[in-house]
A protein has these predicted regions:
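Proline-aspartate-enriched helix->loop->beta-strand connector
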Residues: 54-55
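Glycine/Thr-rich phosphate-binding loops of Rossmann-like dinucleotide-binding domains
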Residues: 67-68, 82
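Short, polar loop motifs at secondary-structure junctions
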Residues: 44, 58-65
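Ser/Thr/Gly-rich flexible loops in soluble cytosolic domains mediating phosphotransfer, phosphorylation
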Residues: 73-101
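Short acidic active-site motifs
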Residues: 44-49, 83
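Short glycine-rich anion-binding loops that position phosphate/pyrophosphate groups of nucleotides
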Residues: 13-15, 63-65, 78
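Conserved active-site segments centered on acidic
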Residues: 2-43
């Protein structure tokens, strides 16, 4: 495992759901003994925040378009809890495949 994976967590307003999703990801990372760092922001600022934080992946709890230059996961399961474990598996598998965490 390499450096911590930088995860940009985004939603429509960058308030409650962003914080909830980030905390859930941090807790799951600790449980799996994977190093991550989370950054938070608004979907409207997507391109600016990706350029500023240079994340390894994005978890968005609001709708956004796929970007060819970065992996984007839907974070809706972190809020609804439906499919949450599957999302964790996808995210942490991706992190491992990138040699991060």
């Amino acid at each position: 495992m390499g450096r911590p994976a930088v995860i940009l967590v985004m939603c429509g307003s960058s308030v409650a759901t962003t914080n909830l999703a980030a905390v859930k990801l941090e807790n799951e990372a600790k449980r799996r003994k994977v190093k991550i760092e989370t950054r938070k922001g608004k979907i409207a600022d997507f391109d600016t925040l990706v350029e500023r934080h240079k994340p390894d992946l994005v978890v968005a709890t609001a709708q956004t378009h796929e970007r060819p230059h970065i992996k984007v996961f839907s974070g809706v399961p972190l809020i609804s809890t439906i499919g949450q474990e599957e999302l964790y598996n996808q995210i942490f598998t991706y992190i491992a495949e990138q040699g991060l965490g």
